[in-house]
């Protein structure tokens, strides 16, 4: 029994060491990516960035990532939540957005769109309709508040998924493209981070995000 207890303790110590190493790697990667973003000009001093915010881990990580950047260069950030009128628990989402913005002292905006109506009228899928209306609504708010950029929380897993999806659809090798880091006034600052890295960092800083 004593031997078994010792083995369990050793396993726990090994797990803790691995987690510490992983956390240090993520911290280094974050600092490196912040530096790259500044050098590449993806985000510049005095940029006003509107974050497409759902309350999920990706958008919460994106907020904290840009907040770190805010401490390095002078940028302004706000968050926007789009209600697609497709979920029954929207009230929980709105409550979370309000609590998040208050606890992080960040301005937030909410816009409502009727995805089903748009999909029927334009004979498009719900997914495509939601995407089109979402970007349209975010762009409208961006102009209204005088911001110059929109940031989305696409990560490395999304990028790989998009590439594979296009490959399976039979897209030619020359036509295969992953998600771009920037397109017009839209930037994707966390595109090089894996989902596991995002979750690990959020747990480290004890961040709260909305569960699906």
Residue ranges and their predicted role:
Residues 1-25:
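Long, low-complexity Q/N-rich tracts
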Residues 23-51:
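A short, basic/flexible loop-to-alpha-helix module at the beginning of a structural domain
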Residues 43-93, 109-115, 180-182:
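ATP-dependent adenylation/pyrophosphate-handling site
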Residues 44, 140-148:
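Glycine-rich phosphate-binding loop signature in dinucleotide/nucleotide-binding domains
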Residues 63, 90-98, 195-199:
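Short, surface-exposed alpha-helical segments at coil->helix boundaries
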Residues 64-71, 99, 140, 169:
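Short, well-ordered alpha-helices that flank and scaffold nucleotide-derived cofactor binding pockets
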Residues 82-139, 173:
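ATP-dependent adenylate-handling ligase core
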Residues 149-153, 158-212:
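Catalytic subdomain that performs nucleotidyl-dependent activation
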């Amino acid at each position: 029994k004593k031997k078994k207890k010792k083995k369990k303790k050793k396993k726990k110590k090994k797990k803790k060491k691995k987690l510490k190493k992983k956390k240090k790697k993520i911290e280094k990667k974050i600092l490196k990516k912040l530096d790259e973003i500044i050098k590449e000009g993806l985000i510049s001093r005095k940029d006003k960035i509107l974050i497409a915010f759902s309350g999920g881990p990706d958008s919460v990580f994106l907020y904290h990532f840009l907040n770190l950047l805010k401490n390095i260069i002078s940028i302004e950030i706000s968050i926007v939540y789009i209600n697609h009128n497709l979920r029954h628990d929207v009230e929980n989402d709105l409550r979370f957005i309000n609590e998040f913005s208050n606890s992080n002292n960040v301005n937030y905006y909410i816009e409502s769109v009727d995805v089903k109506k748009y999909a029927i009228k334009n004979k498009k899928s719900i997914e495509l309709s939601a995407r089109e209306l979402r970007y349209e609504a975010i762009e409208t708010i961006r102009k209204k508040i005088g911001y110059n950029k929109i940031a989305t929380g696409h990560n490395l897993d999304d990028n790989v998924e998009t590439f594979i999806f296009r490959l399976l659809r039979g897209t030619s090798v020359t036509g295969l493209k992953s998600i771009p880091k920037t397109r017009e006034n839209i930037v994707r600052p966390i595109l090089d981070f894996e989902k596991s890295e995002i979750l690990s960092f959020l747990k480290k800083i004890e961040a709260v995000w909305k569960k699906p």
